[in-house]
Regions:
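N-terminal amphipathic alpha-helix/helix-capping segment at the start of soluble metabolic enzymes
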Residues: 1-33
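Structural preference for beta-strand elements that scaffold enzyme active sites
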Residues: 18-20, 45-47, 81-83, 116-120, ...
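Short, acidic/polar
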Residues: 26-40, 98-110, 157-167
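Catalytic domains of carbohydrate-active enzymes, especially glycoside hydrolases
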Residues: 33-53, 116
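Glycine-rich, proline-tolerant flexible connector loops at the mouths of alpha/beta enzymes
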Residues: 45-74, 121, 128
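Alpha-helix-loop-beta-strand connector modules within alpha/beta enzyme cores
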Residues: 60-90, 113, 135-146
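Glycine/small-residue-rich loop that forms an oxyanion/phosphate-binding "nest" at active or ligand-binding sites
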Residues: 74, 82-121, 128
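Catalytic alpha/beta core domains of metabolic enzymes, predominantly
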Residues: 123-187
Length: 187
């Protein structure tokens, strides 16, 4: 892992924290409209939470083609770095666990088509071999990787957090990310 990650004109790990705005709209029209709006704001990064878009869609090859087309539309609007995220239900997102194989296929399609600048992979949702394969594919296509873990019900023990972050680093992601819900001052 490097200390400074350069994505387009943004350097993560250098100077001031960066502002990232999520896009949680459900239709292509709403997604494009919102990105046009936030692109005018003083933000650094856009995160497309595709789990909101995919929540009510029956997955098929057309879904992948739509994601590619949406990414092309987004790139016409903004030059800001874009994170592609499909957050699982258990980590605060909209995707159910029965969508697993589709998640892997969509990530592969997004990576091979160089649709986005970064992808966010959940360490406790995806199988380790799938994470390794996706990271390898992402590196081959010059796409940065975030490995994340979220728990919005509690903060795990310090030992568990250190274990998770070390595992993320061992998997050779570009950016390890954890987000937990503090319940008391100790957290």
């Amino acid at each position: 892992m490097e200390n400074i990650i350069k994505i387009k004109n943004i350097k993560l790990g250098e100077s001031a924290p960066k502002i990232c705005v999520p896009v949680i709209e459900k239709t292509e029209k709403e997604i494009i409209k919102y990105i046009k709006y936030i692109n005018k704001l003083p933000i650094d990064i856009i995160e497309w939470r595709a789990d909101f878009y995919l929540e009510d869609i029956i997955y098929n090859e057309e879904s992948e083609i739509n994601i590619i087309e949406i990414s092309k539309s987004i790139k016409k609007i903004t030059n800001k770095p874009i994170i592609f995220t499909m957050r699982s239900y258990k980590e605060g997102g909209k995707l159910k666990s029965d969508f697993y194989n589709n998640i892997i296929d969509i990530y592969k399609t997004v990576i091979k088509n160089k649709c986005f600048d970064l992808i966010d992979l959940e360490i406790l949702t995806l199988k380790e071999r799938d994470i390794k394969n996706l990271i390898k594919l992402a590196k081959e296509n010059n796409i940065k990787t975030i490995i994340s873990n979220h728990d919005f019900n509690k903060t795990p023990s310090k030992k568990h957090i250190v274990y998770i972050i070390n595992k993320m680093i061992k998997l050779k992601c570009d950016i390890p990310k954890v987000a937990y819900m503090p319940k008391n001052k100790k957290d």
